[in-house]
């Protein structure tokens, strides 16, 4: 007996299951991704063995009481405090031991100096640097290290396996307290000293802890470490940094797969290889000490750092108040796991010929791919593995589809790409409508993508900085735009020309597009070592299998000849120009035993006899789009089924009539093959990119690239819905339309900055010591720089000068400032210099000294050929000049009011030997020392944060001409 009501299938390809299930999958994955990205795992209530979190927090508070740049007296105080803490921790560990613990050697490096250049480090012209070290080096002898103090011999060399270096710089910038840049790194390193001198945690290989000084001013401390004997011993490293102000510590970079695996064992790993590629491709312009350890020394290691929010980076909000013990524990736990793995490793992966010209004999690593899953697990594998899978997919996937297509043609079941077929007996033509919907997907994708990207240009035109404080409003707008218009266009197309092949054609188009993307990704993997395209490999793999399933579904259809014969018989009994809209009755459906298991036989199906209960509207075409949803619902109630829920539901009977034989539940398998992995990988990548870039506009970075990036990522994240989106009910798209309208209005009209997301403006005060004239300046973006400058009481409207300032289109506004009080005595005596000629006319000697400072400069209007600082070490690994000469020499001393003697060699082109002698002052811990900076901090709008422009807050100079 025929049931009067069709059985319910919760995963059928009908509007409600498609809408509910797909929405639940997206929400179930996106919400945890956002939560994991922003919430830091809590620190344990009780400190684990070997560490003391309460002690670490108190150390952080002490370290960040004042600004402590290299050129400040508070930096000396931090240096002395660190020495006391190191000795105290070592002594405490020694007293608590019942057995003999590891030897601990502390080196207060007050002898090392070095001359080097900025070539390859900064984007500016070549700059020469002379630096005197204030580093603190701690060596914990490993249980398997060779005994003796080889470093005391001038030519001493370590023996055995190489050691492990953990580095953290203890200087801050002059405008930030340095809680995360790099206070947390420093106290983490102190806790590592405590941990590895605690019984049960002694290192097998030697561990070197480097507290380096001078990173903020040019990576100077890391360069100086090259002259310390311990630099010969360390083969691997872990660099601890901060480029934000809290949150999770991220794996920024890693040199190779082998060293990354140790980090991957952390309890809460966090990061993606995308960051490494961004540095490699110069998308990220700033550098950390990692650059020196890897690029200059040839060491193998990792760069772990905080990365957001950048609005607090290098400002007075980089303090203990704006970080947390949870962030401390996140970095500390990762550092313990990574370091413990490295010092316990006894293999040969980090020893042997490195093939880098003899920098270090630390073996050869392999380029790696890595990314985390929800901050709790970590995938690490070689780039060669990714490349191999990419090539295999590029070859195998198309071949599989071709073979399947050939098989479908062979069994006469290829309905795709077929307009009609012929009845072999009569020669009559029967339409299959197999091309219907073939070009629908590119239309949907093209229009929805174009509209989403158009919003990027609109926001950039009207309110370009809105992302600075409201990145999720931008994301919501982009996602809503893409989703709503993709659904709307799909529904219009489905209303006009319903097609059961929409899914198959959509996946076929996605297959082709992702195949092209994978070709490009594979080329970059091989030729440039770019690994961040890993998501394309997974994306394509899912799409390829989903596409194959769509082709396999066609095997369940009747042969086109059998279908043609049946339609020929029906048309003889029901002549109508609109016969292609008629659907088979309930009795025309195959039974559950025959639907997909055997070929269609027209004799198996009987026509339904009309009765007084037969609907008069049966098989009638829809007449209005307004009735789109209701028509589907009413049809469902009027359709009977013989209990086979695996068949295509008949409420979509305006599609091709043969579609009733397609599997109704296949869509859910296709969706689960593509959507979850895409949401996870691209969702995490999208948030990572957003966190790294959404506030770079204040530094002159291109924000249009960010908006377009979010638009493209939004499309890629929602793309797995496109093959099914025509089945969505109107409820969620309508809700998203309201979200789109609300976020669009907000993004176009809202003020882009807030108390938590202040616009950074960079300060410097330049003083001509010969005349006493000085110019205070703020550098920032238009138009906000003008509002900030005019809010300062000392600024007079008629004396403001604003000019373009270098990279990123920022503006520099200058005005006569209040005279600073950075040194005692008349300002003309703040800098002393003497210029004398030597026997060689090409060489001139400069003697330079400054009051209450240990940083000066020589600037040349045209580059010089070479220079030499008396008493300096020169390392052949670190050239201090280049083919185009040197335009600036930076001089750093560990002693206050030092006198530098510099011999300068001019080039033949130096017909006029002109330039400046300049000294810098960076200590702003006392009020009224730099009164103009005090006024800027006090009276600038609440949405402004003041940071440094260059190494010195105050620059005092004399011009010279020889």
Swiss-Prot record:
EC number: 3.4.-.-
Principal cellular location given in the protein's record: membrane
GO molecular function: metal ion binding; metalloexopeptidase activity
Subcellular locations according to the entry: Vacuole membrane
Cofactor note (record): Binds 2 Zn(2+) ions per subunit.
Residue positions the entry lists as glycosylated: 110, 113, 834
Function: May be involved in vacuolar sorting and osmoregulation.
Family recorded in the similarity comment: Belongs to the peptidase M28 family.
Name of the protein described by the UniProt record: Vacuolar membrane protease
Record organism: Arthroderma benhamiae (strain ATCC MYA-4681 / CBS 112371) (Trichophyton mentagrophytes)
